[in-house]
């Protein structure tokens, strides 16, 4: 059986996500994947430069000193921090921790995740510099 009625198609503008702050922040957070791809490609380039010997490594280090590359790496750092912040805020919603018959709030878990991140980063930095 076919119908002669036209299907209702709701119009949607290409910039629909710009109307609400929630959607703008969501798009910004999802956009942090682009700097992550940049950093992944940069790491792969560094590994292959290291494989090619001292001359290749020196070329990679001079590439890293380019102001544009430095700017992209700083942008990538901020994108990674934003992504980390949003995931750390999401973690307490996925886990119910009950202490003395009361559900623990999200703040202790978020703070603990940041402490672990800072400690792990400090250890990695110390090992790299020693």
Curated annotation (Swiss-Prot):
Presence of keyword Translocase: no
Topology relative to the membrane: Multi-pass membrane protein
Keywords: Cell inner membrane, Cell membrane, Membrane, Transmembrane, Transmembrane helix
GO cellular component terms, semicolon-separated: fumarate reductase complex; plasma membrane
Subcellular location: Cell inner membrane
Gene3D superfamilies membership: Fumarate reductase/succinate dehydrogenase, transmembrane subunit
GO-annotated molecular function: succinate dehydrogenase activity
Transmembrane segments: 30-50, 60-80, 110-130
Keyword Cell membrane: yes
Superkingdom of source: Bacteria
Subunit: Part of an enzyme complex containing four subunits: a flavoprotein (FrdA), an iron-sulfur protein (FrdB), and two hydrophobic anchor proteins (FrdC and FrdD).
Function according to Swiss-Prot or TrEMBL: Two distinct, membrane-bound, FAD-containing enzymes are responsible for the catalysis of fumarate and succinate interconversion; fumarate reductase is used in anaerobic growth, and succinate dehydrogenase is used in aerobic growth. Anchors the catalytic components of the fumarate reductase complex to the cell inner membrane, binds quinones.
Membership in a protein family: Belongs to the FrdC family.
Protein name: Fumarate reductase subunit C
Organism (species): Yersinia pestis bv. Antiqua (strain Angola)
Gene name of the record: frdC
